[in-house]
Amino acid sequence: MKRIIKTIAFVASALAVIGCAKAVQTGPNEANERYFNAWIGLNHPGISPTGLGIYVIEEEAGTGNVVKDDGFVYADYIITDLEGNITSYTDKETAKQLGTYDTTTYYGAKVLTTTKNTIYAGLADAIVGMKAGGRKKVIIPSWLMTYSSYDKKEDYLKNSSSGVNTIYDITIRDYTDSIQLYEISQIEKYIKDNPQIFDSRMVNDTTGFYFQPLSKDISTEKFEEDTTIYINYTGRLLNGLVFDTTIEKVAKDNGLYSSARTYGPTKVNWGKELSDLTLGSSNSSVIDGFARTLWHMHPMEKALGIFYSPLGYSFNGSGASIPGYSPLIFEIEIVAKPED
C-alpha cells in the first residue's frame, strides 16, 4: 500500500513539474531537471549532490590504486534506470538471475577509459578519485550522461543530451595509466603461473607477443609463398573462456557448439609476408597475433601464441566473448589436408 501511495505521489508531483515546465522553458533540460529533482525528493529526501551534480547513495572505500582522469579502469557494474530495471551488467550471477546467462559470454571486469570525451561525464565524476577495491552506488542525471565535457556544471544543463537518468552500482577492480603495459603484465603472470606449458623455447621477439612451441620434434622447413596449409585452432581468453575453435569436441565441451557450423581443419593461404596470410576459401584476413603465431610455425607443428590486444581486437573487442583490451591465446596445430 505504501508503495502504491508513493508511486501516486510521485506521478502527481512529476505531472505538476512537467506542467510548470511547459509554462517556463529556460533550457533543453528544464523539464528533465524538474522531473529528476522530484524523483530524488521522493526517493532520497535530504540527500545532497556532489561534484557535477551526482548523488552518491552507497559507498565503500578501497585501498588500491587511485583512479585518475586519464587512464584505464577495470570495473564491475550493474546499471539500472530509476525504476530499478537492469540495463547492463558485468557479472555472471546477475545474468543467471535474469535468465540471460550464456556459456559463450565473457563475464567479469571490463575496461573503462577515464579520459575526457571517452566516458560519461557523470560516471567520470563518480569514479575519478576512487581506489581499487572501492564501490559506489550513484545516481546520475540525464544531462550528465554525455561524453561532452564543459568547464562549469551549469553548462551541462544548458546543452542538450540524449542521455537518460541512470543508477550505477560500480566496483573498481584496478586502475592503470598504461593499458598496454598492464596487458603485458597479465600475460607474463599467466606464463609464470603455467610452467607446465612455457619453457626455454618460448620466443618473445615482438612487444606483447609470445610464441611457445608445443611439439617435441620440430621441422626446420619453412613454407613457401602461395603454399596452402591446413590447421586446427582454439582461441581462449586468459581466464580460459573458449571463444572460437575448429574442433567439434572442444566446441561441445565449452558450450559453443553450433550445428550450423562445419568443424574440422581450415585452410590457410600462405604469403610473402605475415600480413599476406588469409584464412579459408574466402581469403578472410586474420588478426596480427594469429598471423604472427602461424608465421613462427613449421610443417605439422603444434604451438601456442599469446598476445596483447593491439595484436588482437584492440579496444573494441569482438562480440560478447571478447571484451575490449583483451589478451588472447591461440593454440594452433598444422595438420594434413583433409580428405574430400
What are these language model-derived features?
Residues 20-340:
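Cross-family detector of peptidyl-prolyl cis-trans isomerase
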Residues 1-20:
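Sec-dependent bacterial lipoprotein signal peptides
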